[in-house]
């Protein structure tokens, strides 16, 4: 069982970071394998987002608010896929949720973005003031999927891409980033690594 988990984690890392140096992830992989002993392996092809959910998100004023709500929805749908009794609750640390949603700015600004979503009636907070849990109130578990989410990196940018803005998926690692020119094919990290490889190849040709 442990070798299977390790292989799946390594495959996931290499899909999202084709040029990863695996020795840098040794400790992280070992910790993940150890933690996985408590839960069975569960593979998901994608998280399905319905048109009704997207319509609910579009009702919220502000693009950053929509990005954050979309990200929270994706996390809630994932949680439901692995635990049908989750009832829309997510427990991901807020700092991680903001990062996944590509919501930038001060902590006060980020808190204000979440408060706007709460005041719009799309999320619910727990009674405990010190809890980071959030309940997403717009989950549609029966509708036909309009969008399939297979990558939880840059979910905010994925939402903006769905909205028709100038974002694209890197041809090498699949990361969704902003398109600054029509010629862009790669994210910055992959472009830098490809350029380094080309430079090494040219050096060997000249040697």
Region annotations inferred by a language model:
Residues 170-176, 190-193:
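Short Cys/His-rich metal-coordination motifs, predominantly Zn2+-binding knuckles/fingers
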Residues 159:
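Donor-sugar nucleotide-binding helix/loop cap in glycosyltransferases
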Residues 165-168, 184:
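Residues immediately within or flanking Cys/His clusters that coordinate Zn2+
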Residues 1-65, 81, 86-88, 94-156, ...:
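Modules that initiate DNA replication and primer synthesis
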Residues 127-129, 162, 202:
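Short helical patches
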